[in-house]
Amino acid sequence: MSQNGQFLEYTLQVIRRGVEMGGFPEDFYKLLSRPKRIIQVSIPVKMDNGSYEVFEGYRVQHNDALGPFKGGIRFHPEVTLADDIALAMLMTLKNSLAGLPYGGAKGAVRVDPRRLSRRELEELARGYARAVAPLIGEQLDIPAPDVGTDSQVMAWMVDEYSKLAGRNAPAVFTSKPPELWGNPVREYSTGFGVAVAAREVAKRLWGGIEGKTVAVHGAGNTGAWAAYWLEKMGAKVVAISDTRGTVVNKAGIPGEQILKVYMEKKRDKSATVLALEGEKIADSNASLYQDVDILVPAAIENVVREDNVGLVRARLVVEGANGPTTPGAERRLYERGVVVVPDILANAGGVIMSYLEWVENLQWLFWDEEETRRRLEAIMSNNVARVYARWEKEKSWTMRDAAVVTALERIYNAMKTRGWI
């Protein structure tokens, strides 16, 4: 997590720049620089040893001009309210850019979920759902998983909310297990979307992604699935890292093997990509510095900074994580001719899939995996095409500028039409 509100500061810089470049009034920035609502909750959990711990949680509802609030719930020991505000702001931009009928929100609990037993984790999840229940709902705020949470956590939360509501309420939470109103595509939707974004930009830059080399920073859900789908699309993954280090193999690292490690890690926390064939490097950031065509930072924010951007050698950076590149580092990359596909465009596959699941749940219908993936791919491809065309037109802009201004236009028009501005 960021220190001293740095991530929030960077996010506000992005919004400020977008407002200025888009020619929006100053009042628009003032309204976007503060969330509409901040919910702070205390969640008591009876631990396995019989004692009680009280965990601090948040739900930040940033802007709902376009529709219900939408964003994930993060369980992390170092999460701060400032981080949560920044992430909610990014969700507002991401949802707008994707053309979804959502505003932006984010939730968090300050906890290390790895230190909880399954029973303790379930009690915490249900406690959080109870605490925020009065201010969420299928037409109000629709949470989903994020770092430290998963489909099982969503299952506990939707069950708890349904008990409180006195009815089945599948559309209140998304990214649920397929056994409980979920869709199998959600497991890999973010990574798949990152791969689609990389493919579509590579097609326009170089004529295609076939044979292009890729390094992935982060072997969690987004990184592992992005690697898998990039290989399926014809690219060659030559480096990938996790918290224990980096493995490099110029001959290529099979996507199925990367996925296997990711799946093993769900059962055994000691599983690592260092078990894969190739050169082992103790530094997990070594994947950022490989001589490759495409870099996918897919772990945490602020990993490409002004103090290390000179070591980045990729020609194209596709942001799988939220905020992995600081504004100063991005300016340096831009000056060197390195293209950065911003997070609000590249990693929107997860929330687009959440939207599709929400639509299914509201209507009590179900699309099969192939149809769902087709719809997701079409939305991602169209979004990239729109942003790329605008970026080409505005020669002095970065692709993030094009994405942010495009997102802000939709939000501004909705707020103006409502009479909010």
Swiss-Prot record:
This is NADP(+)-dependent glutamate dehydrogenase. SUPFAM superfamilies: Aminoacid dehydrogenase-like, N-terminal domain (SSF53223), NAD(P)-binding Rossmann-fold domains (SSF51735). Substrate binds at K70, K94, S354. Gene3D superfamilies: Leucine Dehydrogenase, chain A, domain 1 (3.40.50.10860), NAD(P)-binding Rossmann-like Domain (3.40.50.720). One of its GO terms (molecular function) is NADP+ binding. Optimum temperature is 90 degrees Celsius for oxidative deamination. Retains full activity after incubation for 10 minutes at temperatures up to 90 degrees Celsius. Keywords: NADP, Oxidoreductase. One of its GO terms (biological process) is 2-oxoglutarate metabolic process. It comes from Pyrobaculum calidifontis (strain DSM 21063 / JCM 11548 / VA1).
